Amino acid sequence: MQFGRTYEEFEVGAVYKHWPGKTVTEYDDHLFCLLTMNHHPLHLDAHYAAEATDFGKNVVVGNYIYSLLLGMSVPDVSGQAIANLEVESL
């Protein structure tokens, strides 16, 4: 069984779907905020977020989402890759 793709196996414009998916919960976001000492009320205070955003509720920390996406890509890139040199767009 091969884990990951080599550089030559990636194609420009290809879409790679990663399993398993992840449903982000309020608990996940709050835990990430606490672990990273991000205490901005936009992420933790529902009353503040309801008044300060167009969403009407807390906003998930962008770094958390990026970390999840990067983690989901590990099976495709980490097994054969020597280094991850660049992430151009997500």
Q: What are these regions, as identified by a protein language model?
A:
Residues 1-89:
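Hot-dog-fold acyl-thioester-processing enzymes
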